[in-house]
């Protein structure tokens, strides 16, 4: 995910100007929004171009080598076009690599270092704040369209997957108080947000670090617990979509909320693999037969449930037999939304010590076979929707029609619904669409 701050809502002539690039996952996007909100509250304006700014901030991603390369490229472009650059984010936790290539950066800070970023901006270009021109919207500065927003409920992660270095970059799990999360969500909904996308490194672990501590919300106390938070969010009148959910037993508790229509029947659950031996090397939950049984039970409770997952092929030591286990599992699981990545070594990850690297051409071939198998599953599931009427939230609209998403589709990572309509549609509208045609990943229909 790459996002650039838009200056469309800024005013004033003498205020210092900031250009901002946000790379990586939705959690990083929320970090970017917090930084921008703080700076806008101090009177800074946003510039669409690097060469029109007083300073450039690049929020980096350091999860994969390819993400690091993208971050370094973005830093290089900012240096070339402006020369006054502040770097933050996950890659900033390892500043030596950045400083070696770009020694003249103004500052390099790590993830979640909001105060350090703001301090670096102050040092580079002091604020010229005018409270009479302070028109910050109550929901803060957002890098997403106005009708949806990411809601981050915690930082860090307690898991120690061998392919991942996030805990070393962002630390252990730190959950936000439930009352704080709910107040932010309420503010977003009042500002016109129609869809809340709940994100963290491990959403289903929410509150474990606080022993499910309570905090005030409206006229009552609410526990910092996965089910309790999901239930309360479901009362705010917006679509609520759960991302990055581990397959813990207590996930079962939220499925009835989906069946009742309180939250979206959508579960983003990165499973990573299906072979018990590969999962053991990954240090991931390993009983996928039991997981199949749980998925069947979930679908009995909530037939509309859409499960999204991501998988890694070519993990060190992955044999053809282990890969075939994965193929068999996805054919049986019939997941609605699936992504697949070729394994990339990450500096500092324990998986690097496993040896037995899978050749690049084998990884590419396995990814092709995996996506081919999933496309067949997806096409059958999509065709079953032809003739049905689905609620669709509109993302883009024009004279030739509109594009939106069903309850089974998250922005940027899932499919779209292409909508023909006799009446004008606007982004953020939620309309009923009769599905007339289906592709492997997209649907086509008419607004009714």
Swiss-Prot record:
The keyword Iron-sulfur applies. PROSITE patterns: MTTASE_N (PS51449), MTTASE_RADICAL (PS01278), RADICAL_SAM (PS51918), TRAM (PS50926). Its cofactor is [4Fe-4S] cluster. InterPro entries: Elp3/MiaA/NifB-like_rSAM, Methylthiotransferase, Methylthiotransferase_CS, Methylthiotransferase_N, Methylthiotransferase_N_sf, NA-bd_OB-fold, Ribosomal_uS12_MeSTrfase_RimO, rSAM. [4Fe-4S] cluster 1 binds at residues 25, 61, 90. SUPFAM superfamilies: Radical SAM enzymes (SSF102114). One of its GO terms (biological process) is tRNA modification. Residues 383-448 form the TRAM domain. Keywords: 4Fe-4S, Cytoplasm, Iron, Iron-sulfur, Metal-binding, S-adenosyl-L-methionine, Transferase. Binds 2 [4Fe-4S] clusters. One cluster is coordinated with 3 cysteines and an exchangeable S-adenosyl-L-methionine. Catalyzes the methylthiolation of an aspartic acid residue of ribosomal protein uS12. Belongs to the methylthiotransferase family. RimO subfamily. This is Ribosomal protein uS12 methylthiotransferase RimO. The lineage of its organism: Bacteria, Pseudomonadati, Pseudomonadota, Alphaproteobacteria, Hyphomicrobiales. The gene is rimO.
């Amino acid at each position: 995910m790459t996002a650039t701050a838009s200056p469309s809502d800024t005013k004033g002539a003498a205020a210092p100007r900031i250009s901002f690039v946000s790379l990586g996952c939705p959690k990083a996007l929320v970090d970017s929004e917090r930084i921008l909100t703080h700076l806008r509250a101090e009177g800074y304006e946003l510039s669409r171009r690097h060469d029109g700014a007083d300073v450039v901030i690049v929020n980096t991603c350091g999860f994969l080598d390819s993400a690091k390369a993208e971050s370094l490229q973005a830093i290089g472009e900012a240096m070339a076009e402006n020369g006054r650059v502040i770097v933050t984010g996950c890659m900033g936790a390892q500043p030596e690599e950045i400083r070696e290539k770009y020694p003249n950066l103004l500052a390099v800070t790590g993830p979640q270092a909001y105060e350090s970023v703001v301090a670096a901006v102050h040092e580079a270009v002091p604020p010229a704040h005018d409270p009479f021109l302070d028109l910050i919207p109550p929901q803060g500065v957002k890098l997403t369209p106005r009708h949806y927003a990411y809601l981050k409920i915690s930082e860090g992660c307690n898991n120690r997957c061998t392919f991942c270095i996030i805990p070393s970059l962002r630390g252990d799990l730190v959950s936000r108080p439930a009352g704080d999360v709910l107040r932010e969500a309420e503010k977003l909904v009042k500002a016109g947000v129609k869809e809340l996308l709940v994100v963290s490194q491990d959403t289903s672990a929410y509150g474990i670090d606080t022993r499910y501590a309570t905090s005030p919300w409206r006229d009552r106390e609410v526990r910092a617990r996965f089910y309790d938070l999901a239930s309360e969010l479901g009362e705010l009148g917006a679509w609520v979509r759960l991302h990055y959910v581990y397959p813990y037993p207590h996930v079962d508790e939220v499925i009835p909320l989906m069946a009742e229509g309180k939250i979206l029947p959508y579960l983003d659950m990165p499973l990573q693999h299906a072979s018990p031996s590969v999962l053991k090397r990954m240090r991931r939950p390993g009983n996928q037969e039991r997981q199949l049984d749980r998925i069947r039970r979930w679908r009995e409770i909530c037939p509309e449930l859409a499960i999204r997952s991501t998988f890694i092929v070519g993990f060190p030591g992955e044999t053809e037999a282990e890969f075939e286990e994965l193929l068999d599992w996805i054919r049986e699981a019939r997941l609605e939304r699936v992504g697949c990545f070729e394994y990339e070594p990450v500096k500092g990850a324990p998986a690097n010590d496993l040896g037995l690297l899978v050749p690049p051409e084998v990884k590419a071939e396995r990814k092709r076979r995996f996506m081919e198998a999933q496309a067949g599953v997806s096409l059958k599931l999509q065709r079953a929707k032809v003739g049905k009427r689905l609620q669709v939230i509109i993302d883009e609209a024009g004279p030739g029609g509109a594009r939106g998403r069903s309850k089974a589709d998250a922005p940027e990572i899932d499919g779209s619904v292409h909508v023909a309509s006799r009446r004008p549609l606007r982004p953020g509208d939620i309309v009923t669409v009769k599905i007339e045609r289906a592709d492997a990943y997209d649907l086509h229909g008419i607004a009714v």
